[in-house]
Amino acid sequence: MILDMFRLDDKVAVITGGGRGLGAAIALAFAQAGADVLIASRTSSELDAVAEQIRAAGRRAHTVAADLAHPEVTAQLAGQAVGAFGKLDIVVNNVGGTMPNTLLSTSTKDLADAFAFNVGTAHALTVAAVPLMLEHSGGGSVINISSTMGRLAARGFAAYGTAKAALAHYTRLAALDLCPRVRVNAIAPGSILTSALEVVAANDELRAPMEQATPLRRLGDPVDIAAAAVYLASPAGSFLTGKTLEVDGGLTFPNLDLPIPDL
């Protein structure tokens, strides 16, 4: 049956930034598809709430509260997953982000910090996870969460957009290095209604122009990204590697225009 190809029965996944937003949605979707999940983020209470939902779906959950802005901390999650569940099949590098700023106010340290948070953490966990995937499962799948800002240009996103563009290309490079036993793909979300857009969601004057600028005339839901992640992690996506799925409502130009004046 075709739907069976989207199952993740008895797989083990690590998801960074799994306490809320996209990470929480992906964790719950993986559990509903049959996977056990290690979720990691900074806030224990958020992790506990997501873990409760995973267990309610009939799967095991393990939580790690840590500051994942540091690659050396993120790298430890792979071994913790094997310690908790006995193996590791899937990694979702979801943690990341950088606050918008004008180009002339963006320092070289800001660029380096954005790269470390968005690319360095993904690389550290991937390098730690792959040997364990090979040892315990014979292979696996890595999914990196990039962004449309890694493809489109908008004012205020020099550091963030550059880092997410690097993550998308890192995905292509890692896929070639790790084939054929480990697949590496990315998802580039558009404007998704998470806490990062809570101000937009509550204000029709802000939300309506963003929806109008999106060809599908709506903003995304975290489940849109979760569904793409299930596809990439499951046998249904077994012939994809090195690709970035653009789950953005059809954007060809940014739908968020920060009030940054002309020079």
Curated annotation (Swiss-Prot):
- Name listed for the protein in its UniProt record: Uncharacterized oxidoreductase Rv0927c
Residues binding NAD(+) are: 17-41, 164
> What are its E.C. numbers?
1.-.-.-
User: What is the originating organism of this protein?
Assistant: Mycobacterium tuberculosis (strain ATCC 25618 / H37Rv)
Residues given in the record as substrate binding sites: S147
Keywords for this protein: Oxidoreductase
What InterPro entries would the database entry show?
A: NAD(P)-bd_dom_sf (IPR036291), Sc_DH/Rdtase_CS (IPR020904), SDR_fam (IPR002347)
GO MF, any single term: oxidoreductase activity
What Gene3D superfamilies does the record point to? NAD(P)-binding Rossmann-like Domain
Q: What are the BP-aspect GO terms?
A: symbiont-mediated perturbation of host innate immune response
At the top of the EC hierarchy, this enzyme's class is oxidoreductase
Similarity-based family: Belongs to the short-chain dehydrogenases/reductases (SDR) family.
Q: Where is the active site?
A: Y160
Signal peptide positions (record): none
| Keyword Membrane attributed | no
Q: Which CDD domains match?
A: SDR_c
**What GO cellular component entries does it have?**
plasma membrane
